[in-house]
């Protein structure tokens, strides 16, 4: 997958923060080499977070996020500040842009404390260096720049690159479960909710990971699954299905063949599968009047039969036999207070970076609200979670302990 096609969730997210008129947007435009944000002498020109996916050398694929000033005022200003601070949830590296002619302000000091509290690596870019004297020595994560004079911008980018955490061993979606020449069957329903002319991102990424493992990927609809399996001389190593077809696919795939879902694979990839497994047990305890939050990390046009807003609520009501209520969020929106919910059911999070997914998990756990995901919940409600977790022995044991406990 080329840099230009790198999914947003796999890119380093760099957030630029600061007070109004510190020259934050001007610095962003210099760093990106294009007019990403409108600049003006009028305070509060940036009214909403603006983000752009691009390649930023020497880092590579990134998402640059320019945020409103954190000192905005009035009712509208307070909302802008809230949105700016929400960006921290997905920020891998923070850049605080200051006006070097006035020194660090109390609000900027508070922001630095937030970076430290959330363990976000940060850089301080003292802008307007052409209007003040530059100290001979400074901390290694600070630099004086001038957006107006295009000064020290390359050095700022190098400083940001050094703030990137050392690359961890590459995580794999499914390749670590496979050997070269293994056959994997992917079951992809084509219904009214499926996008025209393409596969969705989780399916694309899974196919790519299978190919990189030297394995063989076969893609079929559930309606052709039986014929696909019969055409093979040997049973496939693994069958991966869209979660909504779990019930049908479970009946068609021989019990000696391992079966899981795209959603479960992505939960493991994002590091939240264990919590999702434990959260699924809450489905057994839902009561009349409980509210379940169903949250998706992307936005798409809702159609009849949508899995999040129609199928999941119907399955949950049928499984529990209770009058359960539902709330829905999509994209960047996630409630600041989830304590009113009995359960959060989240999508696989393919469009979210790891930091944002971990924030949502931690946010729910701190309020003692269980969280599970689409694939785990659907498999549990269809009575096949035990089978769906068989490819992951340690996690399978965690579910067995929960189910029998």
Protein language model annotation of sequence segments:
Residues 67, 98-101, 122-136, 143-151, ...:
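G-domain G4 guanine-recognition motif of GTPases
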Residues 117-176, 183-185, 214-223, 260-261, ...:
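Canonical P-loop GTPase G-domain recognition
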Residues 288, 293, 311, 319, ...:
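C-terminal functional extensions of proteins
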Residues 1-78, 86-89:
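Conserved G1/Walker A P-loop phosphate-binding module
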Residues 205-215, 310-325:
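Short helix-loop-beta junction
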Residues 52-60, 79-144, 172-176, 199-215, ...:
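Conserved C-terminal guanine-recognition region of P-loop GTPase G domains, centered on the G4
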């Amino acid at each position: 997958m080329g840099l230009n096609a790198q999914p947003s969730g796999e890119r380093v997210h760099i957030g630029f923060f600061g007070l109004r008129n510190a020259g934050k947007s001007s610095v962003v435009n210099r760093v990106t080499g294009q007019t990403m944000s409108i600049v003006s002498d009028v305070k509060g020109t940036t009214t909403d977070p603006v983000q752009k996916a691009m390649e930023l050398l020497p880092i590579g694929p990134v998402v640059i996020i320019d945020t409103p000033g954190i000192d905005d005022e009035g009712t509208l200003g307070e909302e802008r500040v809230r949105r700016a601070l929400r960006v921290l949830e997905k920020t891998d590296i923070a850049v605080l842009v200051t006006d070097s002619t006035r020194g660090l302000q109390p609000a900027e000091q508070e922001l630095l404390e937030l970076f430290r509290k959330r363990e976000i690596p940060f850089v301080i870019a003292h802008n307007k260096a052409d209007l003040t004297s530059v100290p001979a020595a400074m901390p290694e994560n600070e630099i004086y720049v001038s957006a107006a004079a295009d000064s020290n911008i390359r050095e700022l980018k190098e400083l940001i690159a050094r703030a990137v955490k050392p690359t961890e061993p590459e995580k794999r979606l499914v390749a670590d479960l496979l050997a070269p020449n293994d056959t994997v069957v992917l079951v992809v329903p084509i219904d009214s909710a499926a996008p025209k002319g393409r596969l969705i991102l989780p399916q694309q990424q899974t196919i790519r990971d299978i190919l990189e493992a030297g394995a063989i990927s076969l893609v079929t609809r559930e309606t052709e699954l039986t014929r696909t399996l019969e055409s093979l001389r040997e049973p496939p190593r693994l069958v991966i299905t869209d979660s909504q077809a779990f019930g049908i696919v479970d009946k068609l795939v021989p019990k000696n063949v391992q079966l899981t879902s795209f959603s479960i694979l992505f939960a493991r990839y994002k590091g939240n599968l264990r919590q999702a497994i434990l959260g699924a047990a809450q489905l057994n305890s839902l009561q009349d009047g409980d509210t379940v939050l169903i949250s998706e990390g992307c936005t798409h046009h809702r159609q009849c039969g949508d899995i999040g807003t129609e199928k999941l609520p119907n399955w949950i009501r049928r499984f529990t036999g209770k009058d359960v209520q539902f709330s829905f969020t999509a994209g960047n929106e996630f409630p600041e207070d989830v304590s009113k919910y009995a359960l959060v059911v989240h999508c696989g999070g393919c469009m979210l970076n790891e930091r944002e997914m971990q924030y949502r998990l931690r946010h729910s756990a701190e309020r003692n609200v269980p969280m599970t995901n689409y694939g785990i919940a659907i498999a549990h409600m269809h009575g096949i979670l035990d089978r769906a977790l068989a490819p992951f022995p340690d996690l399978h044991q965690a579910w067995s302990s929960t189910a029998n406990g």
